[in-house]
Amino acid sequence: MKYDVAHRRIWLKGEILDVNDAKVNVLSPTSQFGLNVFEGIPCYWNEETNQLYAFRLSDHYDRLIRSAKLIQFDLKYTKDDFKKALVDTVKANEYDENLSVRQTLFVDGFGSWGSEGPVEMFVAPIPRGRTSAEYNKKGLNCCVTSWRRISDENLSPRIKCGANYINSRVGQREALRNGYDTCI
């Protein structure tokens, strides 16, 4: 059965479930301190083969593992676990369109920013909406934001973690507030 976005199936802690049934402790280190690392894996639907193809999956998983090591997560998952979770999640949703699959490792349970674990994972498919080909036809109205990328000495941008994207959020909000589609 194909699920709508509001009721899509996600993978959380080894189980496929409705996104609305997913639960993460609000006092977990991931909720309180942004202790997570993630990949947004582009997947492209091919009409001729009726197949979904993940783009550079191994490279994405190498970066996810590298980010987890840099942020000092104890990983219980392997690249094979990552791939199986992604495939199972996509199959559970029966999507036949381009996706960005968010694969996130996070610190759950109770604890502080120094907590060791437990390190858990969720996998969530997100329909991509417009493609770059559509943007190429219409164009994008962009601005250069006043917000700058963080320095490697502060919070390393080599770690793909949620906390590293706050500047992107405030830059995007600045662009939208000023009438632009996005920011550079």
Where do the PLM segments sit?
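Short, acidic/charged, Gly/Pro-enriched secondary-structure junctions
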Residues: F82-F110, I126
